Design a protein with these regions (language model features):
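Extracellular/periplasmic, surface-exposed regions of secreted and cell-surface proteins
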Residues: 12-21, 26-31, 39, 76-134, ...
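Low-complexity intrinsically disordered tracts that form flexible linkers/tails across taxa
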Residues: 34-58, 429-435, 565, 570, ...
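Acidic/polar loop-and-plug regions of large Gram-negative outer-membrane beta-barrel proteins
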Residues: 35-102, 322, 475, 483
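Short, surface-exposed beta-strand-loop junctions and turns on beta-sheet-rich folds
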Residues: 127, 486-487, 528-530
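C-terminal beta-signal and adjacent terminal beta-strands/loops
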Residues: 282, 515-631, 656-714, 722
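Conserved small-residue
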Residues: 304, 387, 404-502, 533, ...
């Protein structure tokens, strides 16, 4: 039932009014109609919905109950125990439709005042209109119909100047901008089901229909910008810029606030090869030193600095009661805009007619007054406080090496490399932060028990957890005993501590292009090495025995121990799935021995107790069930793993047809190309062949893989014609 259609067009026009004024305009329009977007079914394989022997072709039509709706055992439906029946019902009976319209018009006027002074006025708008209609059949039916739209408009004007006086060059611009964005949302839906199932109109609601709508957010910004460019003898250049923003997002209800903020920059470069042109070796084409310092300011979300409230209803037997509630985010009276101060130095080197080129950059940046939310005691009536958090530092290097090892009349081989390495550090945080700020996940709650945090002295996004394996005063791992399964498992530390860093050691790429006459082949690799991720599909899939990792110790072939049980209820049975974890039992551990007696095994070695015949090896199923269950997990390489990969990102074949052929077809030039992207991984460090690029989001603090996301490749054939 899922489809996607899109229609789009782009129109551009220019016109010269006279010798010194010309105008240009364009409109970009697209209309998309997605229906029933694909669902993320990856978690179904680890949350118990589907088992490894699940046959979707067999079960996909066995979900309906006799009285209608999803099959249920309490109605005596024959398909009441079908796994995943709700999923199949929703796939078949739910209907989610959207219609997205995007319009982006632009307009500009260019005026040539003198030979060295120009003026430009421009305006653009980004209009996004989304309408949705959701139909859900079944218990708690809902027919959600609504839309939301976003307007973004920008108006600007700028003066540009360029003037050369003997050995000196002066240029630059002065510009002003006005930016406005507004977001509206409207929705209406049924409540409590429908009077007549399958009749899709909101007045068919059993209970009074619910609606919501209005202006959700609005922000305006005024900006004044200037740039000054100076040059001397085409050797030395100096650029100075400045910008002042006035943001409505930092204006308090009483019209105060730090809504105006200025941030400058300065950069310089020296072309060494021009200064020493007479003495420079001929094989050096370019040698440039560059350095810069810049400051960037940033505001926050609309309404973030002002107290707001939510509007809701409570359903009563005689109608609805309308309620208002203040938000749970505490505001501060003097929120400052964020500031990022950065500097960098670099070298650009071109040699051998640009066949060997090197770009090197070292940078360092500090973000101060970063706007973040910190947790506060709920007894205060709020749950979080918006603050200027502190000082976050980033530094690193970037290297690009471009080479052409072979270049002849018909052949050319290009080989390019990039390398980037970034390191971050939390220099300081807000005084109200006792230890750390959680950025993503939860250090000691829910099924997470691991989170990326901001902690003074550590990297941004360092990972902390309270479920590392506990150890005694001598550093020996501690174990617990499960008497029902007669097996040991790792004891949790219950103390939050740093377990690693999510930041990669480095990122890199390799691209090579081989060209023979008009035919070329390009291959691109991307790579990442280092940095931790937490895979919950590995965690729960291993607990349930659905991953390759859970095969270890299952039988002798996979390292399992063989023994004959001496417990009374299993005496004489031979098992082949045994393992003996390293460690001693934690204080207060009582275990039932082989002879049926109970014994305090605190501080005793599990391996020694097995050797003495008092306990037996732990079954593999018990080990995985206890160590990887919801809330019982402990940090190990299956759940939290170093992420490294080499991706085969792109293969492209391009052929430029001879002019004799393209001219016959009425074209000046004709190119044919075939591209294949994301073809797979030459190296992948994650267990169980997980997709290494399936981290939940692109956030700088995200480290989680929640489901089995499939590998997706794309194949594109392109015809490019010039007329």
């Amino acid at each position: 039932n899922n489809t996607f259609e899109r229609y789009s067009f782009l129109v551009k026009a220019t016109h010269k009014l006279n010798d010194w004024v010309d105008v240009a305009a364009s409109v970009n329009f697209s209309n998309s109609t997605p229906r029933n977007a694909a669902r993320n079914i990856g978690e179904n394989f680890v949350n118990g919905t589907w088992t490894p022997n699940y046959d979707p072709q067999y079960f996909r039509n066995k979900y309906l109950g006799e009285p209608g709706g999803v099959a249920r055992t309490d109605y005596g439906d024959i398909y009441g125990n079908v796994p995943g029946k709700t999923y199949w019902f929703e796939i078949d009976k739910y209907d989610y439709r959207q219609k997205e319209t995007v319009v982006r018009p632009t307009f500009e006027v260019n005026m040539k005042i003198t030979d060295w002074l120009k003026f430009k006025a421009d305006a653009n708008m980004n209009y996004y209109y989304n309408r949705g209609d959701n139909k859900e059949l079944g218990t708690g039916y809902a027919n959600d119909g609504g839309y939301y739209k976003i307007w973004q408009t920008t108006f600007g004007g700028s003066f540009t100047w360029n003037k050369t006086i003997k050995d000196y060059y002066i240029g630059g611009f002065a510009r002003f901008e006005y930016y406005n964005t507004s977001r509206y949302e409207y929705s209406v839906n049924t409540d409590g089901g429908m009077v007549v199932p399958g009749q899709w109109f909101v007045d068919n609601s059993k209970n009074p229909k619910k609606s919501d709508g209005g202006l959700k957010s609005e922000k305006r910004m005024l900006s004044a910008i200037f740039a000054l460019n100076l040059g001397w003898k085409n050797q030395v250049y100096l650029d100075v810029t400045g910008r002042n923003d006035w943001s409505s997002a930092l204006v308090y209800a009483n019209r105060t606030g730090n809504h105006s903020y200025f941030y400058p920059s300065v950069s310089g470069s020296w072309l060494i090869n021009e200064t020493f042109r007479e003495s420079m070796p001929s094989w050096i084409n370019l040698a440039k030193l560059r350095a810069s310092w810049a400051q960037v300011g940033n505001d926050t979300d609309p309404y973030a600095v002002n107290q707001t409230y939510s509007f809701a209803t409570m359903e009563m037997y005689d109608g609805n009661i309308y309620t208002n509630e203040l938000d749970k985010l505490m505001k501060i009276a003097d929120l400052k805009p964020e500031r990022k101060n950065s500097w960098e130095i670099g070298l650009d080197f071109r040699t051998f007619n640009n066949r060997l080129n090197l770009d090197f950059t070292y940078y360092k940046e500090n973000t101060t007054d970063q706007i973040m939310k910190i947790n506060v005691p709920a007894i205060s009536g709020v749950t979080q406080q918006l603050v200027n958090a502190g000082n976050i530092q980033n530094s690193g290097i970037e290297i690009a090496l471009n080479t052409t090892p072979i270049k002849t009349k018909d052949w050319q081989w290009d080989l390019d490399f990039t390398y980037t390495r970034n390191r971050s550090k939390i220099v300081s945080l807000h005084p109200n932060v006792a230890n750390y700020i959680e950025l993503s996940g939860y250090v000691n709650a829910y099924d997470y028990h691991i989170g990326s945090v901001a902690k003074v002295g550590e990297s941004y996004g360092v990972l902390m957890s309270d479920v590392t394996q506990a150890r005694n005063e001598n550093g020996v791992p501690l174990l617990e005993w499960d008497d029902s399964w007669r097996g040991a498992y790792r004891a949790q530390s219950k103390t939050a501590e740093v377990v690693g860093n999510m930041t990669p050691d480095f990122l890199g790429s390799v691209a090579t292009t081989l060209t023979w006459k008009d035919l070329s082949l390009n291959v691109g690799l991307d790579m990442r090495f280092g940095g931790l991720v937490a895979s919950y599909c590995n965690l729960y899939g291993t607990q349930a025995g659905w991953t390759e990792s859970s095969l270890q110790y299952r039988d002798p072939e996979h390292g399992g121990m063989t023994w004959t049980s001496q417990y009374a209820d299993s005496k004489g049975i031979q098992y082949t799935d045994g393992m003996i974890p390293e460690g001693v039992f934690k204080e207060g551990t009582i275990a039932t021995l082989v002879d049926g007696t109970k014994m305090d095994v605190s501080g005793l070695s599990y391996a020694q107790l097995v050797q003495e015949g008092k306990l037996e090896p732990t079954h593999a199923g018990s080990w995985y069930g206890n160590n990887y269950a919801w809330g019982a997990q402990t940090i190990d390489d299956i759940w939290v793993h170093k992420l490294s990969y080499i991706a085969l990102r792109n293969i492209t074949i391009n052929y430029r047809l001879p002019n004799s052929i393209s001219h016959k077809l009425g074209a000046k030039g004709l190119n044919l190309s075939f591209s294949a992207r994301n073809l797979g991984y030459l190296y992948n460090s994650l267990p169980n062949n997980l997709n290494p690029e399936s981290v939940r989001s692109n956030s700088a603090s995200e480290f989680r893989i929640r489901g089995f996301e499939p590998y997706t490749a794309s194949y594109i054939f392109t015809i490019n014609a010039n007329f």
